[in-house]
């Protein structure tokens, strides 16, 4: 068995999966998967608690190490990928303020319209930023937080995407 192994983690909307593979030959040593829950309602809300991702990552990493019969010191790197455009709001201490609004959350559609109207038109938005303002993206989620949960908005210091939050958990760095 290789002296150096990598762990790959993918935290998706429905679950977290992971692999341990050899640096030398790329051979997969072990695989693991854990489901995620989803908070949803008829109004388009789609949220998850970031601690669910951390619990899932811990579980998956534990399964990977157990199933591959390798020691932690053989792991030379962990790579993280995951769902995009979820808004993980953190306060100044790095604590999660509320559940993360996910990429598939459409509850923020009115805020998308407000941002577009403020800029002038859908065409002007595309001219300025190259995209329309979509409910799945982060800007409307921040405005939603300001308008619907002002007490939480006042605490907001950092916004991370889901995979960035997992990297923050692993490294302690908010990047």
Regions found by a protein language model. Name each.
Residues 1-98, 127, 155:
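N-terminal glycine/serine-rich phosphate-binding loop of ATP-dependent small-molecule kinases
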């Amino acid at each position: 068995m290789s002296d150096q192994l990598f762990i790959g983690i993918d935290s998706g909307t429905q679950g977290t999966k992971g692999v341990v593979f050899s640096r030398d030959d790329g051979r997969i040593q072990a695989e693991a998967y854990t489901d995620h829950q989803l908070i949803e309602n008829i109004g388009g809300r789609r949220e998850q608690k970031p601690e669910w991702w951390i619990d899932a990552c811990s579980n998956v990493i534990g399964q990977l190490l157990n199933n591959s019969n390798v020691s932690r010191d053989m792991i030379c790197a962990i790579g993280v990928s995951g769902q995009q455009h979820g808004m993980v709001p953190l306060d100044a201490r790095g604590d999660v303020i509320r559940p993360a609004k996910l990429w598939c959350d459409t509850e923020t559609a009115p805020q998308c319209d407000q941002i577009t109207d403020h800029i002038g038109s859908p065409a002007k938005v595309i001219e300025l930023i190259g995209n329309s303002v979509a409910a799945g993206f982060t800007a409307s989620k921040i405005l939603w937080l300001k308008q619907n949960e002002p007490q939480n908005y006042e605490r907001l210091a950092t916004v991370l995407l889901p995979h960035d939050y997992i990297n923050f958990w692993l490294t302690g760095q908010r990047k």
